């Protein structure tokens, strides 16, 4: 099946636009995640893709074929897509085999062919030998695999997944992430995945679409979205970030921003002028802390305000001379003590500047 093309999609519920002017292209065989907070429109987009909803404007195409528009919607059963729901939606009175074979039964696939396909997909998801068990005899992770197998057995070109891991405990959720990604690679099916979990999106995806209030804010590989956020909203949503207020001292690609009265060398986007207020974004893991200053622009005197051991890293809260707070995280930070005077380095390569 060819790629997905979504063009200027609009879906309203009364006066509220759940999805507004949303456009996206997904390549064949790609794993794309729709990421955003509750109410951002990601599940609505998934339901529009599935054919459960009709758009008020815009078009959804797969391989050049129009599947959805205000004029009409191709029924879900004719789209060549599978869907895995958050709640698993497995029938408790049917065995694993009967749950997985349901779509084949509806399609009147011959019994011998159905048995072959069910056996193959159960092996694929790690449920071989459990055909005769009922859902009540399975763990949560196994029930989720039943839901996956049921969607895969009909051999869809596209698989839609609506927060399928949210009901699992943390350790099982982490293991299932790897299994999902491995499954997608082995099958070559295009996965469109919905979640509000940033770590999940980064672990699974070839590309991430970050949504807010029904609009697309940024679309790209996980590393780009995390390290080079397109806006303050994306930077804040994608994980812990320091947002430091400053003013442009010298515009340009080799610019300087004054933060807490000290010069910080950083590349500035076009359009910023001298004296303009800005915010400098940097992740805690990219903040350097040392007992001595190295003399470069980008070093800020600070005091260690708080230290918290988090297991793999130490979380360090720092107070700059003007009272501004920022955080650093790293393995070596447990060598410092609360109240100690230190020097903070903001590496220009890891800084992103947003206009005020």
Predicted feature residues:
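Helix-to-loop junction immediately C-terminal to a conserved catalytic motif
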Residues: 50
């Amino acid at each position: 099946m060819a790629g997905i093309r979504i063009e200027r999609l609009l879906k309203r519920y009364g006066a509220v636009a759940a999805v507004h002017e949303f456009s996206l292209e997904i390549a064949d065989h790609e794993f794309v995640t729709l990421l955003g907070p509750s109410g951002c429109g990601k599940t609505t987009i998934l339901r529009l893709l599935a054919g459960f909803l009709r758009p008020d404007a815009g078009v959804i195409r797969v391989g050049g074929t129009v599947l959805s528009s205000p004029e009409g919607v191709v029924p879900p059963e004719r789209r060549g897509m599978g869907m895995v729901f958050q709640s698993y939606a497995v029938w408790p009175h049917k065995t694993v085999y009967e749950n997985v074979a349901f779509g084949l039964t509806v399609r009147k696939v011959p019994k011998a062919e159905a048995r072959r396909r069910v056996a193959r997909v159960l092996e694929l998801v790690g449920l071989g030998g459990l055909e005769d068990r009922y859902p009540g005899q399975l763990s949560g992770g196994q029930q989720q695999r039943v839901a996956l197998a049921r969607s895969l057995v009909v051999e869809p070109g596209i698989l839609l997944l609506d927060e399928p891991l949210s009901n699992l405990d943390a350790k099982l959720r982490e293991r299932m992430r790897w299994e999902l990604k491995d499954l997608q690679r082995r099958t070559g099916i295009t996965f469109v995945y919905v979640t509000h979990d940033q770590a999940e999106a980064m672990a699974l995806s070839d590309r991430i679409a970050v949504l807010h209030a029904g609009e697309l804010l940024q679309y790209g590989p996980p590393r780009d979205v995390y390290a080079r956020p397109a806006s303050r909203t994306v930077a804040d949503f994608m994980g812990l970030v320091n947002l430091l207020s400053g003013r442009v001292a010298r515009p340009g690609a080799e610019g300087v921003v004054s933060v807490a009265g000290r010069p910080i060398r950083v590349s500035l986007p076009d359009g910023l002028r001298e004296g303009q207020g800005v915010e400098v974004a940097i992740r805690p893991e990219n903040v350097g802390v040392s007992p001595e200053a190295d003399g470069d622009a980008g070093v800020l005197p600070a005091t260690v305000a708080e230290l918290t051991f988090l297991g793999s890293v130490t979380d360090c809260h720092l107070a700059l001379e003007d009272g501004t707070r920022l955080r650093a995280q790293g393995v070596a930070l447990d060598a410092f003590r609360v109240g100690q005077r230190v020097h903070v380095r903001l590496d220009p390569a890891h800084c992103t500047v947003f206009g005020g």
